[in-house]
Amino acid sequence: MKISKMDMSPMLNAYPDSVENNIEGMLGFLQKEEAQDIFGSFYILPSIFNTDLDRGFSIIDYNLNEIYATENDLDKLKELGINLKFDFVLNHASVLSKQFQDIIKKGQESEYKDFFINWNKFWEGKGEMTEEGYIQPYPELIQKMFFRKPGLPILMVRMPNGENVPYWNTFYQEVRYDKVQEQDLMQALQLQYLTALEIAKMVNDQLEKGVIPANVELGRFEKYKKQVVEYVESHRKYLGQMDLNIKSPLVWEYYDDTLRTLAEYGAKIVRLDAFAYAPKEPGEKNFLNEPGTWNLLERIQQLADKYELTLLPEIHSSYEEKTYEILSQKGYMAYDFFLPGLIIDAFEEQSGEMLEKWAQEILDKQINVVNMLGCHDGIPLLDLKGLIKDEQIQRLIDTVVGRGGFVKNLHGQKNVYYQVNATYYSALGEDDRKMLISRAVQLFMPGKPQVWYLDLFAGKNDYEAVRRAGAGGHKEINRTNLSMEDIEEALKKDVVMTQLKLLRFRKNFPAFEKMNNIKIQAVG
């Protein structure tokens, strides 16, 4: 169902393990007197499902992750009057999904052989075959293409017959080789035991150093190299997120089954993650292709209507591109990714002018939004391009970084930042008054307010979590897992209790049920 009567009450947002390492911990908070009658919705991030990577966004299947949640937990949320929002990842599924594992096991005999995008089939006749076994598309066909990482977005996958087949892989990939066991090697290659023992040691030492099997040196056992390399490659393992072929009928059966499952769990809103990458055509950007993207959304909407689900397509783009407006015109909800940066900008510039302008635009154009301060990702300051001056955006980035935030270069492009990573409280200089004003502004803005759990508890930048996560772990700065003792301490703080009072007011005051009669005025 496209937007009709939307529940506009506040929506909590957290990972399933954000409190006490499972949903039961968050239930413990929500059942407290201080948290009663505050949230009407709960957006639980996708690690609640059977996942392997990317903190939940690499989905094996949509069964509940038994480490974090049970159906009984979800029933208890319903008993509290809380409906749910879940993620539906349209573009990709995990290498460990049953569909991809079936391809690895059966090759071209698999019923799922067209479930994912075979790179060479996609580009057949539109490029040159390389020595490595993949087609290099003609330059004019990929010059507009949007890449999330260096090189072509492919993962070479070994088939049962030994052939390496490239599959489209927009996001993460990793190839792993298990340690070679001498007894297995002895049996497979019909070697003497001590020979197998020495070869296994040599191979394992080099694999640990990052040497690929084809470049392994075996010294006096070089005559066995071809057999050894074949053995190691035949035991190759993968991690990654493989792009789905939306032209396959089986993918659409999968989409339908997923939406039905989410509805049965209690979902009312479904966030469409990575949807803009799914439609692909030679020569196109392959990100937000037109009309392919809108055709995809319309078909997904038809499925969602059967289960009375509201779709929330998630996409980051600049204000000047007006993607939020196009989504609204087509009847979808949109994320208000501008509000977090505009509030910080208002404090820094000592002016509410741009906040007023944006709020008025939401009302005038009747844009249905979900807004937020912080979230599981960073603060999307680049989205403000076209709404405020570039110099202001850079000042905002410098301000948040100066207060301890992190930035990451976008897809290897130096000085192009997608988001700035920090808790919202730390981005405000850990100022209680600014935090409360920010929350009040959010709650009086048009839209459904989404509340990141760490903002609610005035969480500070977690540098230890970033250190533990290692390379690429910058987002963990804003994902601290809390104990019930942490929450008990937080509930003693005015900045927390006042936020809860504001949220309770926002949920229960009748005027917020329909927000089209708001009058906006910036003072100062």
Feature map (PLM): residue ranges:
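Active-site and adjacent substrate-binding regions of carbohydrate-active enzymes
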Residues: M1-G524
